[in-house]
Amino acid sequence: MDSRVYIIKFDNWGFMVNLMNKIQILRKISQTLFFVRALIVTGFYLSIVGFIKRFIIGDRILATIITKIIAIVLAFIAGRVFCGWMCPFGFLFNLVYELRVKLFKLKKLPTVDEKIHNKLIYFKYVVLILVVLAYLSGVKISGYTLAYLLLALFLVLGFIYPMFFCRYVCPVGSLLSIFARFSIFKLKLDENKCVGCRLCERKCPMQIKITEKIDQMECIRCFECMSVCKKGALSFSAFTKNTKKE
Ligand code: SF4
Ligand code: SF4
């Protein structure tokens, strides 16, 4: 008996396009709802510093505690779903890079030089350590001006390079990446179906080399790659490995 468990796998292209469109709509709805919720919970004060502090260090607001537990459990099960579906800042950074794609009619998302990118992705772990150290040593960072300056800076950087903050800086993303490393459901590539067109890589906002090695720790489960793969070579599944070329 085939013990593999699939949640998203397709052989029929028409069915796949339909389903992926629905998943993208669902993702947009989820992102919007969580964004509105964040606005209400914070009294319209969207502070990156506050967000990091609440998530990494914690606070006593029940809604935050529940969101944090959900994000970590989801990371264990399916990876960084929080980043792609729930994070209010992820939503904003998603919007700005999509705006750039629309304005400049881009066919391929802008990329950072490969060597620099491969080093920069580790910077967010340094930020995570710094945040914990700052907390332990009693350093307090706050202020409206700083919050909005940081948001503006990362929105501009996110306009130039998709999800810049999420890729390189966010300590919440780095914390969830650690759990995502062991996630049950993973994004997989079937090398027998892949024709090497790299359409998926052109659309990946996290600049993952999907056709070489899918970095599950970096993947934010946006499923943009699956939406553009015309060969159905990508699947999101549990208990399976990448299918090697026969
Ligand atoms: S879009 Fe599909 S077929 Fe093309 S490179 Fe990516 S996985 Fe392979
Ligand atoms: S690999 Fe696919 S699901 Fe993961 S971040 Fe890139 S486009 Fe999104």
UniProtKB/Swiss-Prot annotation:
InterPro entries: 4Fe4S_Fe-S-bd (IPR017896), 4Fe4S_Fe_S_CS (IPR017900), Electron_Trans/Redox (IPR051684). The chain crosses the membrane at residues 32-52, 69-89, 121-141, 146-166. It comes from the Archaea. It is found in: Cell membrane. Gene3D superfamilies: 3.30.70.20. GO terms for molecular function: 4 iron, 4 sulfur cluster binding; metal ion binding; oxidoreductase activity. Keywords: 4Fe-4S, Cell membrane, Electron transport, Iron, Iron-sulfur, Membrane, Metal-binding, Repeat, Transmembrane, Transmembrane helix, Transport. Residues 185-213, 210-239 form the 4Fe-4S ferredoxin-type domain. [4Fe-4S] cluster 2 binds at C204, C219, C222, C225. [4Fe-4S] cluster 1 binds at C194, C197, C200, C229. It is a multi-pass membrane protein. The keyword Iron applies. GO terms for cellular component: plasma membrane. This is Uncharacterized protein MJ0749. It comes from Methanocaldococcus jannaschii (strain ATCC 43067 / DSM 2661 / JAL-1 / JCM 10045 / NBRC 100440). The lineage of its organism: Archaea, Methanobacteriati, Methanobacteriota, Methanomada group, Methanococci.
